[in-house]
Structures are given as structure tokens and as C-alpha cells.
Amino acid sequence: MNNNINFIKCSSYEELSKKTANDFITVIKNKPNSVLGLATGSSPMGVYKELIKAYENKEISFRDCVSFNLDEYIGLKKEYEDQTYKYFMNDNLFSKIDINKDNTFFPIDAFSTNMNQDFESYDSKIDSYNGLDILILGIGNNGHIGFNEPGSLIDSKTRMIDLTESTIKANSRFFKSENDVPRKSVTMGLSTILKAKKIVLVVVGDSKKEALNALMNSKSFDSNWPCTALVNHDNVVVYYIG
């Protein structure tokens, strides 16, 4: 390990999910009006199930919490509402806890066709809540975090990006035709991510091993592996299965 990231090996996905959820629970107990940074995808689903359990057991309340999601598609057809990240969050977390839906924010309305918006205003909105107290991230095979693909700049802010061909192809299974797959998304930038007070990265799946190794062995940011931006932060935990 060549950096000050805290790498924690877990024996199972269940253990990884519980440990990550406990980090969130600790933050929320200490600060009931915590500002949470949330991600979509299969990796954090177990974490959200654990947070729902903690809420049901009256261990924590999300009533005063605020959330900001990492990313969202843009230019999606209305018929695919169930493919939006907003739908995912409502389905897998928000509808099962007591968070105020008015306090759950996304970088864009997925159905928006206006590609010339001030996307950086999302950063200002986060700043207006004094920043994210804790942020969960997943990681892509190529080391992307959010939709910050290889080549992303360390000082990047929330912005619209073109999805890679491999991402479009991977997503096509959720759509009737590849033509319906969104070509663009809006993502928090690397500098937006690094402003979070605590970052928890969950690494699930053998296909992520190369990216995990790149992060473990990095002393400084390498734009070929966007995840290495995390070496510039002093409060990062990485949970991985080994």
C-alpha cells in the first residue's frame, strides 16, 4: 500500500455491505441532519438494504438528512422512467425510509433535453449544505467513479459527459433497442467527489481487480485510472472482497 487509504478486506458481500452501512449509521447518529452522497448500481444495493433495516429497527432516522446522487442520465425517453437513477433510488431506498423526498437531489432531470445547462450549479447546491458528510462510491472495470471515465481531470466539476461505447453496449440490455440507450449523463466531477468529508468505496466483482490494484499501488493521481483521485483525500475507506 503506497498511500493513506484504509483498505479493508471482507470475506463476503454481506460483510462488506454491513461495514459500509455502519459507516453511514455512525455519521447519521453523530449528525442527524447529515448530507449523504449516494450511488446507484448493484454494488451499493446491499448497503441500502442494511440502512433500511437500521431505520426499521429505529436505530436511525433519515428525517433530517439530505442526499445528493452521484450521477444521472440525460436525454432519456419518458417510457424508460424505470431506468433513471432517481427511480432506482426511490425503489431501493427512499420509499422504504423516512427521508423527505424534497431533500433528495440529482444532478439533472433524466428526461431533460436541454444540453446547455449550468451543471456546476449542483456543486454550489452541495456547498450550500456545507458539503457531503459521507459519500459512497462504486468503481468501474476501467477505474471510473461516477461517470468520470479515464482522461477525467482532477479539478473536474459536475458536468455532462458522453458515455463510452462499452457503457452504451452494457446498458443496452435494459432498453428495447440500442438506439434508445442514453448517450450522455451528468456526473459529479472528481473535485466534487474529493470535497466529501468521508468517502467509502465498495469494490465488488473480479472484473474490478485491476482497478483496485491500480488504486492500492498509486502514490498520486493517474488520469488513466480515475479512482486514483482518491489518494488525494485523507479520509477514504475501501471495502473489497478477498
Swiss-Prot record:
Superkingdom classification of source: Bacteria
Keyword hit for Kinase: no
UniProt keyword terms in alphabetical order: Carbohydrate metabolism, Hydrolase
Pfam families: Glucosamine_iso (PF01182)
Active site annotation, chain numbering: 71 (proton acceptor), 142 (for ring-opening step), 144 (proton acceptor), 149 (for ring-opening step)
PROSITE patterns assigned to the protein according to its UniProt record, in alphabetical order: GLC_GALNAC_ISOMERASE (PS01161)
GO molecular function: glucosamine-6-phosphate deaminase activity; identical protein binding
Disulfide bridge positions per record: none
Pathway participation: Amino-sugar metabolism; N-acetylneuraminate degradation; D-fructose 6-phosphate from N-acetylneuraminate: step 5/5
Gene Ontology cellular component terms for the protein in this record: cytoplasm
UniProt cross-references to PANTHER family, sorted A to Z: GLUCOSAMINE-6-PHOSPHATE ISOMERASE (PTHR11280:SF5)
Entry-linked NCBIfam families: nagB
Family the entry assigns: Belongs to the glucosamine/galactosamine-6-phosphate isomerase family. NagB subfamily.
Protein name as catalogued: Glucosamine-6-phosphate deaminase
Species of the source: Malacoplasma penetrans (strain HF-2)
Gene label: nagB
